[in-house]
Amino acid sequence: VDRSDYSDARTYYHDASGKMDLMHLGAYFDPGMEFDLPEDLNNYNREQLEALFDRPFTGTGVRIIKSHIFANHIDHIKKLFSECPMILALRDDDACLGWWVRCGHFNITYPDYAEYYRDLKTMAKIIDWQNRDIRSAWDYYDGFVARDNQELAGILGIQTPPEEYAQNYAQSDLEVKVI
């Protein structure tokens, strides 16, 4: 896995779980974030998207591209990058908003959610919209449901994370599917 998008500035730790945990690691791509993405990705072809995704990377290998707005463009991304697995992460709308608030809401230092998500009302509306599209893709596409990040790494064929970063998705009120 190409981890060249890593920098200390692209990490976020918080104690929402009761202990200091790494919450974000590496580049994030969304409107208004450090690696800004246009809201309507459906107007972009594969080469244009690759150019956007390449910006934080200097290495080679498998790249993990993280974005919330991918939720609204799953069919388009699957069509353009059919050979690439896509990870769907789903948490109930209210639980999703509650977890985000608990983890620091607009005080999260990386990535910066403020420009695109603006306020809690807008954030709640966008979460509902994104989760609706994730649920639709979850039902439409065949795939593999992962119980934890160790199993997810196996499905993806990448190195398993160290034990100190083990995450049981059910205990985190999260569902994860690779399509």
Language-model segments: what does each one mean?
Residues 1-52, 154, 162-178:
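PAPS-dependent sulfotransferase catalytic core
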